[in-house]
């Protein structure tokens, strides 16, 4: 067999090994951590509901709770308060409200789906429609407006202009600011709050908040304790999936594929970090890890004949298909079917076994698109951009991962899965962002491997564009898609915030993973390694 393999020309990618080895198979966290959350309390919660507390003070507290990553403890109270405040129809043209306050309130309302108008920023523009130059002296106001502008939707030109103005202004004044404001501005310019992973942002803000002169010491301690408790829970789950991965032994059986189960868990944690989603995180991690194997089989190993057979086997979804498969992929196919059998048994207990049907159908669609992509590569075919994009929106895996992210979410019902299967506007926006950002980050590596059927190459040929022009266009596509996501998160919606937030959070993980045009999943050393250490290795000192 070795001689036969040597005669087969395979498109090997020679991926780097896992950074983590067996590090997370060893688990030293407290197994009772799940129960500690019942006893965690914050004594100053009364500030949220205290009679006579000013709206501005309450909104600032909500903002602080969210930035510190502890707002999930008070989710219902915060939703009720924001609804009450929104119903007040506050006149933000009143001079009593400064830019910092107005922009913060705007962002909080939009983050929670309330359709507040962007016209409230009009009073900070001159007769020519330009933002007042004097605002450059208001660093906090600029930062707040900068963060608010990322909640914009299509047609909100005032927020487009606000983003340009605040970005340039903050870059100009940042070197002259004092910390912690300087650190906060510098971080915001690299990682936008609305696009960031909530846990990463929480860890960063905890260190900033510690430097605030007016910090609430008890709230700070609570945030640190909560962060460490959640970290312990996440480490337990990472231990579970690492052990599962080790027992499958796919790293040894399929050495051509990326060994990234830790990075897969990082993605799942980004979709939902709260304690009640523990099962969902484990299930999603497993589906991402298995998809990664499939991706690499099509992209970096299988011959067209082997992939023809494997595609048919996935389509038929029957253990009997193993007889036809190449030897190397049989253990994986068996493990994949068994995984979904376990999911179905688990979900049947709560009357949700139908969810696995939608996940499997989405996986079949993904594999069909991988197959098309593989044939393009092998045939040296560069499709027109429209043809490329139609297929590539599926191979970015966002559609499949969005579907599987709801498997372990008890509140996700049949109507939610049916909605996703029809590719709604919000999902398509997510697909676009994932696709073009991935294409930008992986272009040079794929080009070096001889891949010509890439989005950048296709767009360049169809439009007579340079690489730089194509990349600029792809970023424009992503920015417009973010506007669509913001619009679809507005109330009213037939779908719960619980479901919508999974789509949004998965998009945030894309932004973090491909930060700086790097493929942080394939090469995690630079981009993801520091985050993984902060989230799953190093606790915060209390």
From Swiss-Prot:
It catalyses: (2E,6E)-farnesyl diphosphate = germacrene A + diphosphate; (2E,6E)-farnesyl diphosphate = (1S,2S,4R)-beta-elemene + diphosphate. Its EC number is 4.2.3.-. A motif (DDXXD motif) lies at residues 295-299. Binds 3 Mg(2+) or Mn(2+) ions per subunit. Expressed at low levels in leaves. Mg(2+) 3 binds at residues 438, 446. SUPFAM superfamilies: Terpenoid cyclases/Protein prenyltransferases, Terpenoid synthases. PANTHER family: ALPHA-HUMULENE_(-)-(E)-BETA-CARYOPHYLLENE SYNTHASE, OS04G0344100 PROTEIN-RELATED. This is Germacrene A synthase. The gene is GEAS.
């Amino acid at each position: 067999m070795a001689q036969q393999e040597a005669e087969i020309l395979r498109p090997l990618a020679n991926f780097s090994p896992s950074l983590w080895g067996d590090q997370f198979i060893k688990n030293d966290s407290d197994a009772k951590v799940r129960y500690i959350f019942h006893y965690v309390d914050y004594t100053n919660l009364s500030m949220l509901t205290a009679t006579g507390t000013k709206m501005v003070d309450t909104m600032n507290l909500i903002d602080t709770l969210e930035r510190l990553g502890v707002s999930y403890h008070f989710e219902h109270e915060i939703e009720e308060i924001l609804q009450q405040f929104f119903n007040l129809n506050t006149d933000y043209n009143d001079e009593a409200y400064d830019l910092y306050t107005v922009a913060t309130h705007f962002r909080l309302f939009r983050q929670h789906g309330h359709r507040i108008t962007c016209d409230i920023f009009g009073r900070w523009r001159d007769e020519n429609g330009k933002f007042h130059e004097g605002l450059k002296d208001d660093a906090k106001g600029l930062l707040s407006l900068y963060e608010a502008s990322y909640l914009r939707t299509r047609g909100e030109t005032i927020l487009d202009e606000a983003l340009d103005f605040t970005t340039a202004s903050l870059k100009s004044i940042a070197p002259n600011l004092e910390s912690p404001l300087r650190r906060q501005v510098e971080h915001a310019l690299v990682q936008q709050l609305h696009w960031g992973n909530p846990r990463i942002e929480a860890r960063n803000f905890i260190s900033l908040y510690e430097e605030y002169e007016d910090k609430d010491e008890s709230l700070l301690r609570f945030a640190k304790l909560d962060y460490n408790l959640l970290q312990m829970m996440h480490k337990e789950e990472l231990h579970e999936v690492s052990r599962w991965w080790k027992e499958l032994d796919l790293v040894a059986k399929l050495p051509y594929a990326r060994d990234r189960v830790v990075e897969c868990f990082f993605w799942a944690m980004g979709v939902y970090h709260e304690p009640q989603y523990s099962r969902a995180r484990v299930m999603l991690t497993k589906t991402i890890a298995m998809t990664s194997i499939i991706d690499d089989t099509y992209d970096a190993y299988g011959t067209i004949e082997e992939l023809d057979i494997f595609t048919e086997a996935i389509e038929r979804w029957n253990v009997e298909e193993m007889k036809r498969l190449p030897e190397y992929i049989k253990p994986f196919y068996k493990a994949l079917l068994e995984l979904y059998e376990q999911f179905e048994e688990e979900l049947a207990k709560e009357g949700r076994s139908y969810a696995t049907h939608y996940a499997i159908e989405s996986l079949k669609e993904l594999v069909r698109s991988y197959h098309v992509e593989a044939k393009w590569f092998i045939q040296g075919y560069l499709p027109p951009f429209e043809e490329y994009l139609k297929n590539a929106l599926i191979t970015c895996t966002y559609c499949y991962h969005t579907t599987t992210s709801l498997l372990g979410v008890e509140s996700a019902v049949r109507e939610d899965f049916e909605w996703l299967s029809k590719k709604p506007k919000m999902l398509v926006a997510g697909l676009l962002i994932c696709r073009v950002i991935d294409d930008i980050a992986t272009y040079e590596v794929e080009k070096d491997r001889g891949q010509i059927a890439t989005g950048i190459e296709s767009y360049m040929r169809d439009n007579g564009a340079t690489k730089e022009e194509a990349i600029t266009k792809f970023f424009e596509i992503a920015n417009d898609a973010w506007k669509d996501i913001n619009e679809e998160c507005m109330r009213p919606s037939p779908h719960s915030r619980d479901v919508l937030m999974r789509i949004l959070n998965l998009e945030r993980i894309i932004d973090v993973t491909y930060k700086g045009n790097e493929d942080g999943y394939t090469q995690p050393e630079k981009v993801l390694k520091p985050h993984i250490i902060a989230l799953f290795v190093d606790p915060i000192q209390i």
